[in-house]
Curated annotation (Swiss-Prot):
Keyword Secreted found: yes
Catalytic activity: Endohydrolysis of (1->4)-alpha-D-glucosidic linkages in polysaccharides containing three or more (1->4)-alpha-linked D-glucose units
Binding site for chloride: R205, N307, R342
Disulfide bridge positions per record: C47-C103, C156-C170, C375-C381, C417-C440, C447-C459
EC main group: hydrolase
Pfam families to which the protein is assigned, alphabetical: Alpha-amylase (PF00128), Alpha-amylase_C (PF02806)
Modified residues (Pyrrolidone carboxylic acid): Q20
UniProt cofactor(s): Ca(2+); chloride
A Gene Ontology BP annotation from the UniProt entry: carbohydrate metabolic process
Assembly, per entry: Monomer.
Residues annotated as binding Ca(2+): N117, Q168, D177, H211
Protein name: Alpha-amylase-related protein
Higher taxonomy: Eukaryota, Metazoa, Ecdysozoa, Arthropoda, Hexapoda
SUPFAM superfamilies linked to this entry: (Trans)glycosidases, Glycosyl hydrolase domain
Amino acid sequence: MFKFALALTLCLAGSLSLAQHNPHWWGNRNTIVHLFEWKWSDIAQECETFLGPRGFAGVQVSPVNENIISAGRPWWERYQPISYKLTTRSGNEEEFGDMVRRCNDVGVRIYVDVLLNHMSGDFDEVAVGTAGTEAEPSKKSFPGVPFTAQDFHPTCEITDWNDRFQVQQCELVGLKDLDQASEWVRSKLIEFLDHLIELGVAGFRVDAAKHMASEDLAYIYGSLSDLNIDHGFPHNARPFIFQEVIDHGHETVSRDEYKDLGAVTEFRFSEEIGKAFRGNNALKWLQSWGTGWGFLPTTQALTFVDNHDNQRDAGAVLKYKSPRQYKMATAFHLAYPYGISRVMSSFAFDDHDTPPPQDAQERIISPEFDEDGACVNGWICEHRWRQIYAMVGFKNAVRDTELSEWWDNGDNQISFCRGNKGFLAINNNLYDLSQDLNTCLPAGTYCDVISGSLIDGSCTGKSVTVNEHGYGYIHIGSDDFDGVLALHVDARV
C-alpha cells in the first residue's frame, strides 16, 4: 500500500509540475515586485494607482500568518509563525482579501511568502502572536494550529551543512522544525495554503524549501486546490510555486531536487550580476548569461538582483545603496531574456535587524511620496525609480522576442537588441560610450526611457534617431547620471 501511495504521489507531482511553473500573468506583463513589509491596504492602493498602470505582473507579499512579537519588531519576526491566522502588522484577513481582489481586478497577481518548514524559535516565556494567540515554543506547543511536540522533528542543531539529515531535519537558526512527513502536519499546511487560494492568490514563494524533503513538498503541492476561478483564473489552473533553495553549486541538497516541482530562486544569478556590475567581471562575458553560466533553465529560475535576505549580507550582492550600479544591473536583468524576473522594493536599513518604518506604537506606517512619486519616509521603493519601472515597460514591450546583435567593446560596454522591438546599451567603463550601433528598430526617433519619459509625444530625456538600416548614434558618458540607455517601440516619439 505504501509503495502504491508513493507511486501515486510521484505521478501526481510529475503531471502537476509544469503547471506549477505558470505565474498566471495578464497579457504581456512579466515582472514581479516584492513589496517587502508593506501593509495590505497600501498594496491594494499601489496595485490600482501604480503597479497596474505601469504594467507590473504581480506582487510578492510578506508572510500573512500570525507571527511572534519580538522586541523592537525586527523584520524577521514575520518568519516565526505562531499560528495560521491571517493577522499580522500588515493587516487582518479582511484587509488581505480586499487587497487580493483589488489587485486581481487590475491585473496584478499576488504571491504569498509562506513558511512551511518551521514555527517560531525559543522564547523566554509564553510567546504572544500578532493575533493574540499564546504559544510555548520551547515546548513545541502551538495551540493556535494546534501543533504539539509530536508534530516536529527531534531538536538538533545544524552544524554540518553537508549533512542532508541535519539540513532537512534539524532546526534552522533555532526555529522549531516541522515534520512534513506527518499526516497531521501536511493537513494543516494544505489547509492554510488552500485558504489563501480561496482568497484569490496566484501562488506561493516557499521559504526555506531546501530544509524540507522534496518528496514531502511534492505531496503538499499536489494536494492543493486549483486556483479560484472567481478571481479570473482559468479552470484547472495550478498555483505558481517558487521555492527558496540557496545553492552555490556545491550543496548536498541541490536546487535540482526542486526545479521540477516549481521555479527555484537562482541565487547564483544575484551573486554573479553583482560581481559584474561592481566591476569584478567584464560585462562582455554576459553574452552567454543564463544557462551558459550554469544557471537553471529559464522557465525554472526565479531571478533577482537582490532579495530581502542577501541585501543585508556583506559581499558582491548589489542593493539600493549603490544606486548607479544597481540600476544598470536591474536594466540588464529586465532586458536579457532569461528567467522569471522579480524586483525588490525595500525599506532603509542600517543594520541586519532594522524594522520596517513604524510609528511610536510600533505600527507599520504607509509610504509617502514626493512630487515625482518617489518614497520619502523610510521606504526605498526601488520599483518607483523611473529607471526601474521604465524597464518593466521595456520588458513588456519586448516579450517573446529573441536577443540579437550583441555588441561589446571587449570590456564593460555592451549593447543588444530584443527582436525589432527593443534595444539596450550599458557603459560601465570610466570613459564614454560613443558609437553607431544597430538598434534593430524601425526608422524613427525613440525616447530613452532611462533618462526620461515619453509624455504627449515628447521625450523628457535623451532621444535617439534610428536610420533606415536600424542604426543610431548611442552616447553614454562615463559621468552621466545613469550608465544605461533603453529604447523600445512603445516609446517612439
